[in-house]
């Protein structure tokens, strides 16, 4: 497999993870995530020991949805975790975990920084996704873009500074609210993927630095 193919595969994983944080799973998305091609993808991903438990939980949840009621329950989980700002939720915004303020505000420093990154890459948050730019879904989608359009050093710096710097805190909050749930598994898989990607990028960057 060429480096281009590897980077494309990495981008697909980041794009998938981004999509799961961006919106609830609807009927069309469920069909995509449980298709034959998707099953092969999940199977391949689960071969990595650090991903197995999370992938198995994700697959079993998706494959277990057989009616509208179960799909609505998963949508309710998404809404309760990510759209309602209470102590029983886990807001997916970097500023809430990186700011030193007692009550950090949305659209703050991390949002401005991420907006500038997007601007430099001639990208923008889509109008149908009215969220701050430091939303995890935006960051993961941007990383998917970097995989195919930027040097390894740029990718590594973004992952370490903008994603890995707060992801564990977010997941800790999420698992407290949603222990052993679908979105806890998605978040845990995201952290494991980011950690592995950093570990693979570091040697490559060290060689050329």
Curated annotation (Swiss-Prot):
PANTHER family recorded: CHAPERONE PROTEIN TORD, CHAPERONE PROTEIN YCDY
Function: Involved in the biogenesis of TorA. Acts on TorA before the insertion of the molybdenum cofactor and, as a result, probably favors a conformation of the apoenzyme that is competent for acquiring the cofactor.
Cellular component, GO, one term: cytoplasm
Name this protein carries in UniProt: Chaperone protein TorD
Alphabetic keyword roster: Chaperone, Cytoplasm
Gene designation: torD
Subcellular location: Cytoplasm
Family assignment from sequence similarity: Belongs to the TorD/DmsD family. TorD subfamily.
Domain of life: Bacteria
GO biological process: protein complex oligomerization; protein folding
Listed InterPro entries: Chaperone_TorD (IPR023069), DMSO/NO3_reduct_chaperone (IPR020945), HscB_C_sf (IPR036386), TorD-like_sf (IPR036411), TorD/DmsD_chaperones (IPR050289)
Native source species: Shewanella baltica (strain OS155 / ATCC BAA-1091)
First and last residue of the signal peptide: none
């Amino acid at each position: 497999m060429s480096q281009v193919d590897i980077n494309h595969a990495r981008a697909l994983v980041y794009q998938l993870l981004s999509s799961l944080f961006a919106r609830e799973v609807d009927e069309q998305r469920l069909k995509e995530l449980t298709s034959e091609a998707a099953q092969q993808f999940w199977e391949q991903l689960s071969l990595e020991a650090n991903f197995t438990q999370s992938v198995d939980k994700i697959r079993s949840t998706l494959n277990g949805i057989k009616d509208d009621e179960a799909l609505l329950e998963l949508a309710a989980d998404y809404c309760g975790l990510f759209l309602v700002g209470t102590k029983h939720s886990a807001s997916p915004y970097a500023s809430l975990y990186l700011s030193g303020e007692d009550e950090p505000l949305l659209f703050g420093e991390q949002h401005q920084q991420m907006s500038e990154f997007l601007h430099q890459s001639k990208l923008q948050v889509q109008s149908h996704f009215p969220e701050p730019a430091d939303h995890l879904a935006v960051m993961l989608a941007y990383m998917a873009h970097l995989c195919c359009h930027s040097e390894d050093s740029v990718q590594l710096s973004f992952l370490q500074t903008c994603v890995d710097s707060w992801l564990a805190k977010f997941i800790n909050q999420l698992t407290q609210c949603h222990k052993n749930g679908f979105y806890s598994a998605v978040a845990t898989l995201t952290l494991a993927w980011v950690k592995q990607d950093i570990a693979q990028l570091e040697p490559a960057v060290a060689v050329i630095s």
